[in-house]
């Protein structure tokens, strides 16, 4: 009886180890991509509302246009400033990418060099969203899976400002890949 229990436990350990490595194999790791944290700080809960009425700016009906911004958090948040770099695409090598991932909070992103292409995990047509130097975009976070690739022949870079719940991982690898894109 004791020997049978030992074999059952050994089999369970081997199975758990195999599953651990199989799950890692399904992950979509970054390739040709580096991320450097430039700054990190923690802030308590806050609510900020701003508005601005630009002078001499009206809509089609002659009404003044108003700019609005609202940010509200509950609980402490970590604020990151990240510098991200993608290597240039080289013939015969994989395209530099972040791998499929998500973030627990949103990111404000400015492309500072080259061109980046963002693909959304919930887009059945795998539509490329292309951003070149000087352009900005928002990643909504909250489990929103995406991959950012440098499909160009020059190095691409961006700066990302991320607001996430305090103490949580900044990046969450998505495994397996969503399956909506051919890569």
Language model region names:
Residues 4-7, 18-82, 129-130, 175-183:
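A short, N-terminal "cap"/entry segment at the start of jelly-roll beta-barrel domains
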Residues 96-103, 120, 129, 149-150:
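Short histidine-centered beta-strand/loop micro-motifs
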Residues 74-77, 86-110:
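A short beta-loop-beta micro-motif enriched in histidine and acidic residues
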Residues 132, 141-169:
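Ligand-binding loop in jelly-roll beta-barrel domains
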Residues 84-88, 93-96, 120, 124, ...:
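N-terminal post-signal-peptidase region of extra-cytosolic proteins
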Residues 121-143:
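Short acidic-glycine-tyrosine-enriched beta hairpin
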Residues 103-123, 135:
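Glycine- and acidic-residue-biased ligand/ion/polar-headgroup-sensing regions
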